[in-house]
Amino acid sequence: MDIELSGGRLRYQEVGSGPPVVFVHGLLVNGDLWRKVVPVVAGAGYRCLVPDWPLGAHSVPMPRADLSPPGVAALIAEFLDRLDLRDVTLIANDTGGAITQLVMADHPARIGRVVLTPCDCFEAFFPSVFAPLPRFVRIPGATWLLVQALRLRALHRLPLTFGWVAKRNPPADVIDSYLMPSRISPEVRADLRRFVAGVHNRYTLAAASRLGDFDRPVLLAWAREEKLFPISLARRLAAVLPDARLELIEDSYTFVSEDQPQALARLVVNFLGATT
């Protein structure tokens, strides 16, 4: 399905019926990140909306969109407005969690509750291993070089690619769905560059200073073995948010929806059942 927003056309999938649940993935992945979780949540009686946000693995470029972190947060808010979604549950991961915190701080009206899985927050936007990326992509040709280098599957287990976000390699077709759009489309690559170049932790730090006003329930479903976003960050979020609880997921890195989808889905369904 497609929807026309002020910044361009956004592609999304919709599964199930009931109270709305909107999924927010991170950088260089798309809605396929949630493919093992959505059927369980939809089967429990929820309307799951799974957009491909313009973060580098989307198939429809958005050249007119403001792709700064606040701009993408506004895009999420516009998506909720255009579909007139109310009492929405946002479920976010990785970079998408940082953007979701901006939505919570600046556009909370339609949000009923939030699930944050391991994600950027506070000063860790990006985490230290990825901190050079905003400067790097400003070098002419650097984004092209980056996405072409990711052709080499041997690189996919390195910390700078998928090695520290997933304990288990996603299937080859899923990896291709993540990496092919920016490899073959200059317009998607330009979107990717614009977003990455605009990342700065001033956004997440500013959002964190306002999260104390977000009084709706928040589940922090964090990976115990998290390498990029240590549990200490989750505990800091829990201390800032008025109604948050932390649950730890075993045997997983950042992509808990990839490594432990059933465990995540159980936590989500139980949380929704207790708060909707």
List where the protein language model places each region.
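A conserved mid-protein helix/loop that constitutes part of the nucleotide-sugar donor-binding site
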Residues: 32, 232-235, 262-263
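Conserved beta-strand scaffold positions in the cores of enzyme catalytic domains, especially
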Residues: 2, 48-50, 93, 246
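Hydrophobic pocket-lining residues within nucleotide cofactor-binding pockets
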Residues: 53, 249-252
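Catalytic histidine-centered segment of alpha/beta-hydrolase-like enzymes
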Residues: 252-265
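Flexible "cap/lid" subdomain of the alpha/beta-hydrolase fold that forms the substrate-access gate
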Residues: 10, 27, 56-87, 91, ...
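Conserved HGGG/HGGXW glycine-rich cap/lid loop of the alpha/beta-hydrolase fold
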Residues: 13-58
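Alpha/beta-hydrolase fold catalytic core
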Residues: 1-21, 43-46, 85-86, 250, ...
